[in-house]
């Protein structure tokens, strides 16, 4: 079990203790630092909805360092990002692979960021098939449908032609931060918070 740091703050009412993720949430920062599971997705969705209810006109900042995970869980986060009113800016630190890369690209155009030494990876959805032949066929068809959906999302957010997306995601496709910027996955590469324009943090 991982250790979650506690932050203690002084106020007029005395000391208040927050776990680090709750403290970040006060600054409208959501941090994805694990694989994407149903449980993780539900927490992130709840945070997105909470921040929308707090202020529907203020940006939400979504920081990502994730190897990816369940496609259906990731799509639930993606749909919520598109559904809510606030702009969701995304920032990759470390890695954004598979479904996490899709979430990175899904930030609002112009506010998708990466740090200099990130690794971003795209590939087609994977699944282990077992059971009777008809069951395997059904599962294979579902994987193909998911692949088509994910490719359409990448086309929408990167501006790349679907033929290129299909070709690039056929196998693991790695990008540096600068390559991801050229590809249309992110808009800016930052080495320091000081280099972020005020408009990027609003």
UniProtKB/Swiss-Prot annotation:
Keyword Ribosomal protein: no
GO molecular function terms listed in the Swiss-Prot or TrEMBL record: ATP-dependent peptidase activity; ATPase binding; serine-type endopeptidase activity
Principal cellular location given in the protein's record: cytoplasm
Protein localization: Cytoplasm
GO CC, alphabetical: cytoplasm; endopeptidase Clp complex
Catalytic activity: Hydrolysis of proteins to small peptides in the presence of ATP and magnesium. alpha-casein is the usual test substrate. In the absence of ATP, only oligopeptides shorter than five residues are hydrolyzed (such as succinyl-Leu-Tyr-|-NHMec, and Leu-Tyr-Leu-|-Tyr-Trp, in which cleavage of the -Tyr-|-Leu- and -Tyr-|-Trp bonds also occurs)
Cytoplasm is among the record's keywords: yes
Class of the enzyme per the UniProt entry, highest EC level: hydrolase
Tree of life domain: Bacteria
Pfam families hit by this protein: CLP_protease
UniProt xrefs under Gene3D superfamilies: 2-enoyl-CoA Hydratase, Chain A, domain 1
EC number: 3.4.21.92
GO biological process: protein quality control for misfolded or incompletely synthesized proteins
Keywords assigned: Cytoplasm, Hydrolase, Protease, Serine protease
Active-site residues annotated for this sequence: 98 (nucleophile), 123
Record's function text: Cleaves peptides in various proteins in a process that requires ATP hydrolysis. Has a chymotrypsin-like activity. Plays a major role in the degradation of misfolded proteins.
Matches recorded under HAMAP family: ClpP
Subunit: Fourteen ClpP subunits assemble into 2 heptameric rings which stack back to back to give a disk-like structure with a central cavity, resembling the structure of eukaryotic proteasomes.
Family per similarity comment: Belongs to the peptidase S14 family.
Protein's UniProt name: ATP-dependent Clp protease proteolytic subunit
Gene: clpP
